Amino acid sequence: MQPVSQSSAEPGPKIPVRTLGRQLKATYGRRLRRVMLDLGLTCPNRAGEKGFGGCIYCTVSGSGTGAAKRLEPLQAQWEVGLKRARKVNPEGQAAILYFQSYSNTYPDLQPLADGLEQIRKWASVAPILSVGTRPDCFSPKAAELLARQTEFFKEVWVEFGLETADDNVQKIIGRHDTLQSFHDACALAAEHGLQRICHCIAGLPGEKPGGLLRQVDAAREAHVEGIKFHQLMVLRRTQLANLWTAGKVHMLDAHTYADMVSEALEYLPPEVVVHRLVAEAPKEEHLAPLHWPARAKVHTMIEKRLTERSSWQGRLLAT
């Protein structure tokens, strides 16, 4: 695995957050762009094993590109993604291969295994492989399959949806997973030398005050290497859209969200890479929150809150 450079990404008074962009530049000398790959799979809370319809905030494309539903082969998906990545890095290493949509280790491993066999030839250009899945869909065989990919890629990440540390909220949002399965999956991935990234959502229906802090606590206890922060968003073609239209969902404003994330960061270990500070969706899909600033502006708001109080990622862990 590629050694991680600490110096130029280390959080402190001048650099308040260890962002992925900073970490990639420290490690690879450049930023790498994700190339989204879609295998056209599903999730247990869509297929009937744990429910139907999926999580209330998830679109019919599984929060991905929907390319597989359009019958686009992986080669075509790669070519489109690489073209975009080459705008940033015209030569050499340029990309992160990211299996994003749905749960990529469910219902069985054969589609993922076939996909991995296809994409290995791109490892010289895309040194990092990232695979998203639910914690309750991550088995020892899945861990072994991904661990074998370290022969081809410099880094292999597995991205687990945590979303909330409250099992009751898991039920409210139709996810039907548990905090314990998150910890079990993270432990299993660690045993196989895989880097763990967790997704956290702020503002879910039923979430109690301090919910984002509890998610960071869970991430810290699981010793994850990376984390993504998302504000709750209402997208078209989701169950959440119906609830929002009926006035049954409260949305966070950008200032409240920036307050929540900046506070949570102070309790996040400084070595954890922050892969995302704020989410963004295509304008044609986005319904709410309304009047939300551009992603870069919210990013700046979060870091500014930290610098204004002379703080940074992980500063309060020692107090």
Question: Locations of the language-model features?
Answer:
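N-terminal [4Fe-4S]-dependent radical SAM core
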Residues: 1-93
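Hydrophobic faces of well-ordered beta-strands that scaffold small-molecule active sites
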Residues: 33-37, 95-98, 129-131, 156-160, ...
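Distinct, well-ordered alpha-helical segments
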Residues: 109-117, 139-150, 212
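Conserved C-terminal portion of the radical SAM core fold
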Residues: 180-239, 255-278
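Alpha-helix N-cap and loop-to-helix initiation/capping positions
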Residues: 73, 111, 173-181, 207-214, ...
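Auxiliary Fe-S-binding modules of radical SAM enzymes
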Residues: 1-22, 26-33, 226, 233-319
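Core AdoMet radical
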Residues: 61-81, 85-109, 124-138, 155-181, ...
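Structural recognition of alpha->loop->beta junctions
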Residues: 55, 119-125, 214-228, 298-313, ...
